[in-house]
Amino acid sequence: MKTFSAKGHEVQRDWFVIDATDKVLGRVASEVALRLRGKHKPEFTPHVDTGDFIVVINAGKLRVTGTKATEKTYYRHSGYPGGIYETNFLKMQQRFPGRALEKAVKGMLPKGPLGYAMIKKLKVYAEATHPHAAQQPKALEL
């Protein structure tokens, strides 16, 4: 018997919506990364993007445990000498709600072209409204 290998054009992709209100950042990110990758499906193939589309709403209401709200730091660099910028979780959530979740999920996905294709299927919104109602996303409880 031959081992099944999924083909990219034959994969059935579903849409899911996750409400992140008062959920812990890492727990939401790990479940989102698992579903973006397609590891929850029996036809999972490591070198093929078999994942689903994920819409995360209320990302501005995510929380972290302990003292990570003030101590977890995010870095970015302008490309110029001495051009490193540093911020914490609270400031990041106030300025760009949802970016902390995007960075957490991106770190859990594979690096390279396959990971870049997977992260494009993640849609994060700070509020409860989203423009993907036409896709009829199913609610996903965590």
UniProtKB/Swiss-Prot annotation:
CDD domains the UniProt entry points to: Ribosomal_L13
GO cellular component, one term: cytosolic large ribosomal subunit
GO terms, biological process: negative regulation of translation; translation
Keywords: Ribonucleoprotein, Ribosomal protein
Stored InterPro entries: Ribosomal_uL13 (IPR005822), Ribosomal_uL13_bac-type (IPR005823), Ribosomal_uL13_sf (IPR036899)
GO molecular function: mRNA binding; structural constituent of ribosome
Job description of the protein: This protein is one of the early assembly proteins of the 50S ribosomal subunit, although it is not seen to bind rRNA by itself. It is important during the early stages of 50S assembly.
HAMAP family in the cross-refs: Ribosomal_uL13
Family: Belongs to the universal ribosomal protein uL13 family.
Subunit structure: Part of the 50S ribosomal subunit.
Protein name listed in UniProt: Large ribosomal subunit protein uL13
UniProt organism field: Janthinobacterium sp. (strain Marseille)
Gene, per the UniProt record: rplM
